[in-house]
């Protein structure tokens, strides 16, 4: 059944947004809409839809901020292991390349992935998000690594096809800890907790590798890293 029918009525929707003074709009591209099987043939109708949508945004004076992945992994890829499988990285790289190349003239602001922990740790460790699995720490850590590789491939695609002025970054849901008091001990404890909760992702991106503290903590459950992974 139809709901808001944005697929057919986006131009009306954007007119309403413009009338409210909205000048920026964050949206997500649906991976399965462009590649229904995840790594098969590109669906030209899907790409054409997003071109129409983005052109409409520009007509209404609204700047798009485009997210490449917001949790809608193609089911065919999930059935082959999902984020636990290295093949998902290869499929995402192709998706990112085709999407950025096909839409670069209409987009200047790109977001690679939305909230990595939600589709890795919560999805494959805690099990309260799709696909609802409860795997070992080693498997969860490998999903982190695969997500980081996808971030790297998306950044590379934007650098290759985005053109002058293109920007790209990650949306991450960091955990924040505030010290109870401003004593040196509490401040140090808050910093240590922040590092414990965040550096396996943010540290890996900014330091081009996993921190020694993280590797020592996880031990044998550390993700498998192949040569060149952190060269993206």
Model-based region annotation:
Residues 37-38, 48-232:
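Active-site region of glycoside hydrolase catalytic domains
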Residues 1-43, 47, 53-56, 60:
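N-terminal structural segment of carbohydrate-active enzymes
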């Amino acid at each position: 059944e139809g709901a808001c029918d944005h697929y057919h009525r986006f131009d009306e929707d954007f007119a309403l947004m413009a009338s409210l003074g909205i000048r920026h709009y964050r949206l997500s591209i649906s991976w399965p809409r462009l590649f229904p099987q995840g790594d098969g043939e590109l669906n030209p109708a899907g790409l054409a839809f997003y071109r129409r949508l983005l052109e409409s945004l520009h007509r209404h004076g609204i700047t798009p901020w485009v997210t490449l992945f917001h949790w809608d992994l193609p089911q065919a890829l999930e059935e082959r292991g999902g984020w636990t499988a290295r093949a998902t990285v290869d499929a995402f790289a192709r998706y990112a390349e085709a999407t950025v190349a096909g839409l670069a003239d209409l987009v200047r602001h790109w977001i690679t992935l939305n909230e990595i922990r939600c589709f890795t740790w919560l999805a494959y460790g805690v099990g309260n998000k799709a696909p609802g699995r409860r795997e070992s720490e080693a498997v969860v850590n490998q999903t982190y690594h695969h997500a980081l590789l996808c971030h790297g491939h998306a950044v590379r695609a934007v650098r290759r096809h985005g053109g002058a002025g293109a920007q790209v970054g990650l949306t991450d849901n960091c955990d924040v800890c505030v010290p109870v008091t401003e004593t040196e001990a509490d401040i140090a404890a808050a910093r240590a907790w922040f590092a414990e909760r965040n550096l396996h992702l943010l540290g890996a991106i900014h330091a081009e590798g996993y921190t020694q503290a993280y590797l020592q903590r996880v031990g044998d459950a550390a993700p498998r890293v192949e040569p060149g992974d952190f060269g993206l």
